[in-house]
Amino acid sequence: ASRAGNVWAVTALLAAKAAFGKADLTMALNGCLAGLVAITAGPDTPSPLAATFIGGLGGALVVGSIVTLDKLKIDDPVGAISVHGTVGLLGLLAVPFTNSDASISGQLIGGATIFVWVFVTSFLTFKLIGFVMPVRVSDEEEEMGSDIAECGLEAYPEFKA
């Protein structure tokens, strides 16, 4: 598992450098986390080489997924959808290649079941929270920055837009 995380971090770093012209630590950290997420689907069967291959593929995938979601204007500030959703699905689909007891169709059904469960429960949870308090900050608070609006100070004063 640690090999996958390490390879994913390095691959994500290289993919970010290729895509943006500079190394991106956040992408590397998301790559490391993504490696651990993907290998969790079937950690006992991949060989070290297979774990390395899955890691390399996922490192590039997490960067591409984050960029795609940004272009689609899907609000995912920390890359959670890419790390846990996109790369988690990759991990599910990789299991049959390293475990003869698993099938692609079974993994696809499992992935669809997970998606439906998470979507429905998240939707209902946010609707219930919305009855009690706003789920999103106002436009004014967003422009000001949530750290200032909610805490009264800047979380990262060294970063100015």
Residue ranges and their predicted role:
Residues 1-161:
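Glycine- and aromatic-enriched membrane alpha-helices
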